[in-house]
A protein has these predicted regions:
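Low-complexity, glycine/alanine/valine/leucine- and proline-rich hydrophobic stretches
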Residues: 41-93
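Aromatic/basic-lined ligand-recognition segments
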Residues: 1-50
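TerminUS-proximal long segments
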Residues: 82-143
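General "foldedness" signal
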Residues: 22-26, 74-76, 124, 128, ...
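General N-terminal targeting signals
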Residues: 27-29, 63, 77-79, 109, ...
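Residues in flexible loops and secondary-structure boundaries
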Residues: 18-20, 54-56, 70, 98-100
Length: 143
């Protein structure tokens, strides 16, 4: 978990372990050399944006770099989440989460489905990257 530079968003990033093509840069308030280093490996990233700038309202977001083919068309949950072609990421307005019957489940569905779309479409070795727990909460060995 980290505070993303250039903006006050709180983010979590997962890495595939594979190198990514050089990032083209051009991110506002972020030197190109920093973008190239930050995105030197394939990522699926999600976070919370309090609003302002390109998104006027508070929202959760999720993106992948490099963006795999088909990512923008992936079936993402919950209803209310959408893909922004301007930002090249999925957006879930905070109000959708806040007003849902189960905010935790609503947010988890967004985070889970966007990660799964990124990892599956990019052919990540999920069995080597993910840890699972048994009913007692103990971690199971990787498959």
């Amino acid at each position: 978990m980290h505070l993303f530079w250039g903006g006050p968003d709180l983010a979590v990033t997962r890495f595939s372990g594979r190198p990514a093509p050089p990032h083209p840069g051009g991110i506002p308030n972020l030197p190109d050399w920093v973008a190239r280093e930050a995105y030197s490996h394939e990522v699926s990233s999600c976070g919370f944006w309090p609003g302002g700038g390109p998104i006027s309202h508070a929202a959760f977001y999720s993106y992948a770099y490099p963006e795999p083919a088909g990512f923008s068309e992936a079936a993402i949950q919950p209803g209310g989440a959408f893909y922004s072609t301007d930002l090249r990421e999925f957006i879930l307005p905070y109000d959708v989460v806040r007003q849902s019957e189960s905010p935790d489940d609503t947010l988890l569905a967004f985070l889970r489905t966007t990660y799964e779309a990124a990892a599956d479409l990019a052919h990540w070795d999920r069995s080597a990257l993910e840890r699972h727990r048994d009913s007692s909460g103990a971690f199971l060995p990787n498959r």
